[in-house]
Amino acid sequence: MSSSNLSSRKTRISAHFLDAAPAEDEIVTVEGWLTYYDEEKKSWIPLERAQVTIYVDGREVGKAETNEYGMFTFAFPAPYKGRHKLEVRFKGKAGYESSSKSLDFQVMEREQKLKLGRLARDVLLLIIALVFLLFVAIFITNMLR
């Protein structure tokens, strides 16, 4: 074992929400990766079978374990409407430093989320219609030549 392996290795957490704007009472899912820096390989390596703790607004809501790829997933019910802070913490273990990652998320009212979904659908349909009209205009222009 080299001397660099005897000291604690740096770790980092990367994380994201599957839906960063959930409605009240929906399930919020966060997934992420825990990695450590290997000085010899000069790269970040997945940290397998490590436990991370999940906090929402400073309160512990659960724990997750990383798989063989250093990936973890955790789901919990969305709290009340408003802005919230999620934190994923790795307390460290023999040979590995602790690390944490914070993410902010917004919980919406269910009706507000439905309106936003309808608006997104309408914008998509409008874009499709405009592209269709553009193709028709190009086709007609080419026919008149």
UniProtKB/Swiss-Prot annotation:
It is a single-pass membrane protein. Its main location: membrane. Residues 1-23 form the signal peptide. It comes from the Archaea. It is found in: Membrane. GO terms for cellular component: membrane. Keywords: Membrane, Signal, Transmembrane, Transmembrane helix. InterPro entries: Ig-like_fold. The chain crosses the membrane at residues 123-140. This is Uncharacterized protein AF_0657. It comes from Archaeoglobus fulgidus (strain ATCC 49558 / DSM 4304 / JCM 9628 / NBRC 100126 / VC-16).
